[in-house]
Amino acid sequence: MGIFDWKHWIVILVVVVLVFGTKKLKNLGTDVGESIKGFRKAMNDDEKPAEPVVPPAAQPVPPVQPQQSAPLNQPHTIDVQAQKVEEPTRKDS
C-alpha cells in the first residue's frame, strides 16, 4: 500500500472524466499520439544519411554598394489606411 492505491487512481480517473469529458480526452490522446509519431519520424529521418550537397560553381560576387537613404531631416511616413477598432462590450453591465 503506497500513497496512491489502485482505488485512489480509479477515483482520480472518474474525476478527470467528469471534469474534461470523454471527447476532450479523446482529442488530447489523438494529439499526443500524432505528436509522438511525428517525433519518431523526425528521429528516423535524422538518422538517414543526407544527400551530399554539391557546391555551386564559383562565381565572382559584385561588391555591395550602400543604398542612398533619405536625409535625416525629412519625416518618415507609412502609407496605410487606419481602421476603426470598437471597444468590446461587457456582459456584466
From Swiss-Prot:
Basic and acidic residues: compositionally biased ranges: 84-93
Entry annotated with the keyword rRNA-binding: no
Residue numbers spanned by region Disordered: 43-93
GO (cellular component) term, any one: TAT protein transport complex
Membrane topology per record: Single-pass membrane protein
Biased composition (Pro residues): 52-65
Localization per record: Cell inner membrane
Membrane-crossing residue ranges in chain numbering: 1-21
Gene Ontology molecular function: protein transmembrane transporter activity
InterPro entries with a match to the protein in the record: TatA/B/E (IPR003369), TatA/E (IPR006312)
Highest taxon of the lineage: Bacteria
GO biological process: protein transport by the Tat complex
Keywords in alphabetical order: Cell inner membrane, Cell membrane, Membrane, Protein transport, Translocation, Transmembrane, Transmembrane helix, Transport
Protein family: Belongs to the TatA/E family.
Assembly mode: The Tat system comprises two distinct complexes: a TatABC complex, containing multiple copies of TatA, TatB and TatC subunits, and a separate TatA complex, containing only TatA subunits. Substrates initially bind to the TatABC complex, which probably triggers association of the separate TatA complex to form the active translocon.
Function (record text): Part of the twin-arginine translocation (Tat) system that transports large folded proteins containing a characteristic twin-arginine motif in their signal peptide across membranes. TatA could form the protein-conducting channel of the Tat system.
NCBIfam families: PRK00442.1, tatAE
Protein's name according to its UniProt entry: Sec-independent protein translocase protein TatA
Species of provenance: Pseudomonas fluorescens (strain ATCC BAA-477 / NRRL B-23932 / Pf-5)
Gene transcribed to yield this protein: tatA
